[in-house]
């Protein structure tokens, strides 16, 4: 029996790493793949527990983890390779793209007990936001720029509100410290991506128009949602494997 286990664990498996969005395949033994997987799981748990040790509720978890990312992970400078093997790669390199910020935040939020997933901009798969659920309501955060969206009651706007309200009048962009985004600090936050507030509003309006509805999200399996947030722990990965087997 021991010999059989040894043979199985020594079998080669395929590992994938993306460099500048081109996927590279290489072989590693199964035992090493399992060892690395569990090591990443422990790392996620450790990082999240440290960040959220003083968080009083789920909203504070969302903000505390997002602030930690803003302080510890930089935007990838021009000319530097984009590397992605696992979400932990982003933490190890302390560098991330827009989609990597959103993917990593969703992973860390799920480890913190907050439902979350990454959602891509329909017109550009490299641009994404994180959709999270607090108090039964799905909301949106843009962790790359550190932007949250509040309604007129100064509460995190729901997806329904984001899809229906006018960003100019009924919805306001705020920093992670709840400071309102004004025209004179657009360049400070977004760099050269936008020339003025109108460009920012147009960008987010286009994105929110295509957000999935609350019902669509609630009626979908977590494994059908975007990103890798629900497949990083051993139990969730097992559920994912079973789900794919049953679907097949």
Please state what every model-predicted region is.
Residues 1-8:
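Hydrophobic membrane-insertion alpha-helices, especially the h-region
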Residues 62, 102, 182-183:
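A structural signal for well-ordered alpha-helical scaffolds and beta->alpha junctions
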Residues 71-133:
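Active-site neighborhood of thiol-dependent amide/isopeptide-bond enzymes
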């Amino acid at each position: 029996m021991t010999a059989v286990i040894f043979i199985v664990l020594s079998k080669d498996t395929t590992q994938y790493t993306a460099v500048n969005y081109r996927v590279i395949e290489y072989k590693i033994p199964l035992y090493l793949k399992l060892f690395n997987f569990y090591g990443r799981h422990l790392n996620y748990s450790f990082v999240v527990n440290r960040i959220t040790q003083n968080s009083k509720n789920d909203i504070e978890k969302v903000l505390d983890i997002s602030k930690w990312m803003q302080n510890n992970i930089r935007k990838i400078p021009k000319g530097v390779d984009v590397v992605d093997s696992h979400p932990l790669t982003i933490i190890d390199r302390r560098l991330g793209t827009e989609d990597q910020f959103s993917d990593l935040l969703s992973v860390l939020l799920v480890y913190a007990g907050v439902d979350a997933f990454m959602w891509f901009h329909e017109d550009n798969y490299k641009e994404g936001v994180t959709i999270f659920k607090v108090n039964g309501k799905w909301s949106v955060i843009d962790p790359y720029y550190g932007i949250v969206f509040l309604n007129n009651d100064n509460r995190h706007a729901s997806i329904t509100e984001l899809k229906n309200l006018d960003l100019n009048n009924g919805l306001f962009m705020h920093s992670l410290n709840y400071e309102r985004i004004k025209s004179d600090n657009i360049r400070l936050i977004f760099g050269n991506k936008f020339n003025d507030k109108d460009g920012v509003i147009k960008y987010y309006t286009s994105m929110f128009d295509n957000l999935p509805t609350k019902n669509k999200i609630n009626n979908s399996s977590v494994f059908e949602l975007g990103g890798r947030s629900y497949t990083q722990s051993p139990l969730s990965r097992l559920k994912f494997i079973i789900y794919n087997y049953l679907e097949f």
